[in-house]
């Protein structure tokens, strides 16, 4: 397992990431993976002897004594099944795990293969990249579950219609003479039961509509609201895919690029090891690697996955990449896009009713605008963003399980978010309250994944995966960051002392004229 490395002093304001092994001073880390229909990919790094924290002097530093070589090869030709009677405990995602092929005695195949360039290279991040890391999310903030284009078009039209109707009702009421207003009030009092019955019928129809459009996920067992048909949503997904392809058409890596092959290899391995999971085999998975410093990755409902090279430079090993790609697979398999679209449409419909009431009741347009702004913010921060965080947490949970079934070191998932949190703290970035974000905070993600890892380790054992190496990479990361901070403090202290020494006053030596010395001697 690898982690953050090559960190320079905080005074330099640079952070470096690279694939490297958790070895002592000079080690080799070979991560190989194979799957049907994919080329074999190996990530191989030679780590130079540690000579300090400078980039030109070292590639990484760690604290493991002795020699350590880690080889990992995934075999996709695993057959057979292992029944599980604890489907509820493994999140109802599968009832069987594929096991190692008997031809290989169910042992991890150890061999070295031709190396390809790594997914990430050691490089200093620019200020723009640092800002991107701070805002990093595995899926775009508002496109993790993309809203269909039709709903995006209808939303402003619905809002405008509600404002016009509400304002029209207010103007009509204000224009009525007092006697007419009394007549209207009297009619309302006489027909209050009819109005109550009408509103109750509307509410009942709404409840019936809601429950008849619920669908239970076969993976999580959770009910979700689906308002659009699968065919309609497929067409909308194709439109969105074409829009993304048009935007990135000049930045796509070729299929022969080493980074593309590496991502494809990991994705193919995840799909192969989880083909028994409902929905995965029904999706045609296609990978697109975009040459861009943007640190992001997202998947469309039709299985089109977009990964940016900036994202690849931010992960430190295959295990982290497996978890993050599993997270994106989970978004697509769980139907988060369709679910988010249905929930947004429902909230917009209810919001349109409240908006009409606001513009009808408020006596002035300025007050109505203020109430409308408050209503939109309440909807955003009390419903939309919490719901988005819920979907992200669910994708983390299922993505962790998919990575566990693929025999990845799932402890790396927690390390990744610790890295993101460390970058924020290293640059003094203030922590934004989680309720303001569409994604869980890095720290909360670390805690959540750490709670899930023991269960995922059991699933990994059920799938006859090879045992994980010790020590725990989470512990190593904490030791590394602690050591780095101590070294940074020492370096900053030395710089401070040097500055103080440079600023000390130096006594000026007066030049005594030679004639003065001669006169003094002759006089004596």
From Swiss-Prot:
The active site is at 328. Residues 165-195 are annotated as: Stress-sensor region. It is a single-pass membrane protein. GO terms for cellular component: mitochondrial inner membrane; mitochondrial intermembrane space; mitochondrial membrane; mitochondrion. It comes from the Eukaryota. The chain crosses the membrane at residues 196-216. InterPro entries: Mito/Outer_Membr_Metalloprot, Peptidase_M48. It is an enzyme of class 3 (hydrolase). Its EC number is 3.4.24.-. Its cofactor is Zn(2+). PROSITE patterns: ZINC_PROTEASE. Zn(2+) binds at residues 327, 331, 392. Protease activity is activated upon autocatalytic cleavage in response to mitochondrial depolarization. Residues 144-195 are mitochondrial matrix. Belongs to the peptidase M48 family. This is Metalloendopeptidase OMA1, mitochondrial. The lineage of its organism: Eukaryota, Metazoa, Chordata, Craniata, Vertebrata.
